[in-house]
Structures are given as structure tokens and as C-alpha cells.
């Protein structure tokens, strides 16, 4: 053994002695599988597409409908005339309410699309949109947007017992 080998062995001995009480770190990181992340991404994208479908119906420019400001109502099919009568006298109570006053047109349209998506998912029949007074921009636009959506059966300016002329009550055809 030469001098450098003995020095090296002493250094190694001291090194092992210093690190003898040290234990290996336990790995506690949980790695998500790629499949789980893909499934989550697919669910998120599916939900976004469903909301965009309803938003597309609202922003479609196929036809223009004008409404009389005294009595705002809409009926998709004449077969639902008795439903409109019940809607006018206040027999239907909204199962979900959306308040859009204070929002601009695009935000209100997106929120209305989300509301219609929720109504489809949870099979809600009656909903209400509160547009407020303001400059009557949303008051004029919401009936037009609702009339463009194929699932809306009928709507009517809310009866006095539900909030006067600041909201619209509408009925949605269930998907089943």
C-alpha cells in the first residue's frame, strides 16, 4: 500500500462514518397517471363544448324577431298554447334564476348559454332571467336570444308576483 491509497481509505472511512446515520429519503410524491389527466381534460372540453353549443344558438343571426314592449311573449308551436296561458297567469314557478343586470351583452349571452346548459343537464322545466331596468338593452335582446334557441318552448314577461317587468320566465323542452 502506498501513501495515497492509505490516505484514500482513511478518507473513505471518515466519509462512511459521517454518513452512517443518514437514511434514505422516502418518496412521498404521488404521480398521476396520464389516463386520469386525459379523462379530466376530455370532461372539461366536453362541458365547454356543450356551453358553446347553447351560446351558438343564441348568437345565430338567421332571423330577426321584434316584440311588442307591452306584452313580451313567445310560443314556439301552437300546440303549446295552453302552456303559455298557464305561464301568463303564474302557474309555473322558476326552478332556477339567472341575474344578468350589470353584465354586457356578450357576458349575458354566455351566462344565458350556461343557464340553458344547466337546465338540460338537470332536466329543469322552468327558468327565469332577471335583466333589470337599465337602458333596456338586455330587455330587448334576451327575448330575441331565447326565441332562437330550439329548446325554448315559450316565454313571457314575468307576472307581477315574480318581479314585474324586470325579468322573463321561460319554459324549456326536456331532452327526454
Swiss-Prot record:
GO terms for molecular function: RNA endonuclease activity; rRNA binding. One of its GO terms (biological process) is rescue of stalled ribosome. Its EC number is 3.1.-.-. It is an enzyme of class 3 (hydrolase). InterPro entries: Smr_dom, Smr_dom_sf, SmrB-like. PROSITE patterns: SMR (PS50828). Signal peptide: none annotated. Residues 98-173 form the Smr domain. SUPFAM superfamilies: SMR domain-like. It comes from the Bacteria. Keywords: Endonuclease, Hydrolase, Nuclease, RNA-binding, rRNA-binding. Acts as a ribosome collision sensor. Detects stalled/collided disomes (pairs of ribosomes where the leading ribosome is stalled and a second ribosome has collided with it) and endonucleolytically cleaves mRNA at the 5' boundary of the stalled ribosome. Stalled/collided disomes form a new interface (primarily via the 30S subunits) that binds SmrB. Cleaved mRNA becomes available for tmRNA ligation, leading to ribosomal subunit dissociation and rescue of stalled ribosomes. Belongs to the SmrB family. Associates with collided ribosomes, but not with correctly translating polysomes. This is Ribosome rescue factor SmrB. The lineage of its organism: Bacteria, Pseudomonadati, Pseudomonadota, Gammaproteobacteria, Enterobacterales.
Amino acid at each position: 500500500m502506498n501513501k495515497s491509497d492509505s490516505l484514500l481509505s482513511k478518507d473513505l472511512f471518515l466519509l462512511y462514518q459521517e454518513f452512517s446515520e443518514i437514511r434514505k429519503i422516502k418518496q412521498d410524491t404521488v404521480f398521476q397517471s396520464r389516463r386520469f389527466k386525459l379523462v379530466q381534460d376530455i370532461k372539461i372540453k366536453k362541458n365547454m363544448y356543450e356551453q358553446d353549443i347553447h351560446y351558438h344558438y343564441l348568437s345565430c343571426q338567421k332571423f330577426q324577431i321584434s316584440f311588442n314592449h307591452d306584452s313580451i311573449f313567445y310560443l314556439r308551436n301552437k300546440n303549446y298554447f295552453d302552456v303559455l296561458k298557464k305561464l301568463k297567469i303564474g302557474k309555473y314557478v322558476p326552478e332556477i334564476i339567472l341575474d344578468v343586470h350589470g353584465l354586457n351583452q356578450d357576458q349575458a349571452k354566455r351566462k344565458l348559454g350556461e343557464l340553458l346548459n344547466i337546465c338540460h343537464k338537470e332536466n329543469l322545466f322552468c327558468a327565469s332571467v332577471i335583466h333589470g331596468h337599465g337602458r333596456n338593452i338586455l330587455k330587448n335582446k334576451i327575448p330575441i336570444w331565447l326565441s332562437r334557441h330550439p329548446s325554448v318552448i315559450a316565454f313571457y314577461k314575468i307576472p307581477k308576483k315574480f318581479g314585474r317587468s324586470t325579468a322573463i320566465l321561460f319554459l324549456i323542452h326536456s331532452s327526454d
